[in-house]
Design a protein with these regions (language model features):
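Gly/Thr-rich phosphate-binding beta-strand-loop-beta motif of the actin/hexokinase/Hsp70
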Residues: 1-35, 65-70, 164-196
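Buried hydrophobic packing residues in well-ordered domains
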Residues: 17, 67, 96-97, 143, ...
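Phosphate/pyrophosphate-binding loops at sites that engage ATP/ADP/AMP, CoA/4′-phosphopantetheine
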Residues: 51-64, 146, 220-236
């Protein structure tokens, strides 16, 4: 039985959609589109308007939706929880996070990704991600305007990072960096496991952007190495995003990392 899946990748200034036709025999890309948008102050170029254009360009009848939103909207924390049951973890995460965040737990949507595979024994290491409900609502409202109810909701760059980790040699470490015009997100891959996610603001295009990006990455890695017992020695840096269009980003990343 065939299935249509529409993947919608929402970034801060663009939305990209890929329509996948899936069956037992094959997975085939049927269509794709990449659209810019701006803020709500310009209704004709808003996210809702871009999504409406998407529905006009693609036949979405019967599609299931998988959606990602910008990773910089979330706050990430590495935690260790003294049990492995996922239901119990979900129950205690709001209380574990509330002491480290300037928000009330009831104002957040929280999820997690385990770092040590399937939890076993009495310890689970994880990355918790929390997003304010007030920041999530505009995305959900825009999706609702085209009757899109996501089957899965994730964060930009995370599926790619997990795919890279899944394909990696267990003995080889990597850095994956997503760069757009105003934010960067760093994914630390130790062997074939994701171990850290951090997002940070970047200045607009100009001579200070590349040095600040490199400084943020170096500071993040220094803090990670200080707090972790892992022996992290990346052999490869993979970068992606519209921010790479600036001519000095790649050379400076190469020199710094």
């Amino acid at each position: 039985m065939s299935r249509k899946v529409l993947g919608i990748d929402i970034r801060n200034e663009t939305v990209t959609a890929v329509l996948l036709q899936s069956s037992l025999r094959e997975h085939r890309v049927e269509d794709f589109i990449h659209l810019p948008f701006s803020g709500p102050e310009d209704p004709e170029r808003s996210l809702s308007s871009a999504l409406q254009t998407l529905t006009e360009k693609m036949d979405l009848t019967g599609s299931d939706y998988v959606v990602s939103i910008p990773a910089n909207q979330a706050i990430f924390r590495n935690l260790q929880i003294p049990f492995s049951n996922s239901k119990k973890i979900r129950m205690v995460l709001p209380f574990e996070l509330e002491t480290t965040l300037p928000y009330a737990a009831e104002d957040l949507v929280i999820d997690f990704h385990t770092l040590n595979g399937t939890p076993a024994g009495d310890q689970t290491e994880l990355i918790a991600a929390a997003i304010e409900k007030s920041k999530l609502s505009p995305y959900m409202d825009a999706l609702a305007s085209i009757q899109a109810d996501p089957e899965k909701l994730t964060l930009g760059g995370l599926p790619t990072a997990l795919c890279l980790a899944n394909q990696a040699d267990p003995e080889e470490d990597q850095l994956f960096i997503e760069i757009d015009n105003t934010y960067g997100t760093l994914f630390v891959l130790v062997g074939n496991r994701l171990q850290l996610i951090r997002s940070f603001a970047l200045p607009a295009a100009g001579p200070s952007k590349a040095p600040q990006l490199c400084a943020q990455i170096q500071q993040t890695l220094a803090a990670f190495l200080e707090s972790s017992e892992l022996n992290f020695e990346p052999i490869e840096v993979i970068a992606n995003g519209i921010g790479l269009d600036e001519t000095d980003i790649i050379p400076q990343l190469s020199r710094a990392l």
